[in-house]
Amino acid sequence: MEIKIVRNVLEANNKLAAEIRQRTANSKTLLVNLMSSPGSGKTTLLEKLIPMLQAKGYQIGVIEGDITTTMDAERLQPLNIPIVQINTEPFGGDCHLGAELVLPALDSLDLANLDFVFIENVGNLVCPAEFDTGADVNVVVLSVTEGGDKPLKYPLMFRVCHLALISKTDLLPYLDLNLDLLRQNMLQINPKLTIFPISAQRGDGLADLRDWLIKLKR
Amino acid sequence: MEIKIVRNVLEANNKLAAEIRQRTANSKTLLVNLMSSPGSGKTTLLEKLIPMLQAKGYQIGVIEGDITTTMDAERLQPLNIPIVQINTEPFGGDCHLGAELVLPALDSLDLANLDFVFIENVGNLVCPAEFDTGADVNVVVLSVTEGGDKPLKYPLMFRVCHLALISKTDLLPYLDLNLDLLRQNMLQINPKLTIFPISAQRGDGLADLRDWLIKLKR
């Protein structure tokens, strides 16, 4: 009985995710879902990456997912782009964004005039991986401070993602991290994963990331 | 109807948590539940703290919670202490430890001869806060690399904890973190929170932590 309930939730979610994909296909918008542990640098990445896409003439929107507060959305306000905040607290403090929350958020965006919409998911390396948001691209951000074993310990996240960003590489000189082993562990879980090391603060790797996203643009 | 189901799960969990508290009260064991995002340094903390408690004559046990792998338990094996691994993957890749998993783990430990049992919960700053494990003390570990806004964005975790450890303080010189603001944000969510900054790698703050735990010992 319990399994049936979970299945129904996932089936309902997948149906809404398909509806989202239909909508973004119609408007030729690339929907990119950023997932990670809390504090891996998703918001800082958006602060730096979005102006680089704007400089190439693209129009950007953001869906901010947080349990509570609008702190991340406020950090992005200087970019002068449409931002929709989803707070999951009224829905029981949900630990992830489901398609049922992303779909109404899309209603608030003028998709026909947006080339890229970034979803910043709730900071959590576990649950967001279980729910399809309808995104075209799933991206996991893992900070170098989190340790090289994380892909093996949280495999589903790395299995559902197309791209892994190894963030905060500016801190590498002060850490014991074996970057090659981290890459190997990521590829052991998902051999198709594209991997970019980045430092949003220094700008390292962001041009590669920008060009990779532009190539996927319909 | 859905709310009813969630309530039943939480009620069943709370009943088992009470049973756990009865057992550890009988054996005079202090059960300590460590929670945090992935990669905040829970395992490294246990590697350093446990020998310091052993040096004071205390007997220690550990319950390791992971979705999959026994990597953390293996890191603790040199300590030569009883360790019980709980992998939540067979239970649907659960993102937290519930009392229903901790209770059978206690069966594998000789509680009468253990002064402290540490639970290393699944790395997740959201869901573990929602489920009482039956622990006497809830501890959140937040790494300085995660940013000062996290208590405001993940308030439930800081609300249910007695102690907050600000970890990896050895990295502070390379970060933009305002440590006073982080403390203020923690106390804004939970004014009763005890806070220790620590560096497990350098040993900073660990003697304070050890003495704080010993004072709570029955």
Residues covered by each model-derived region:
Chain A
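Nucleotide-state-sensitive switch-loop elements of NTP-binding domains
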Residues: 3-22, 26-32, 40, 49-135, ...
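Residues at the starts of beta-strands that form the adenosine-phosphate
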Residues: 59-60, 137, 162, 194
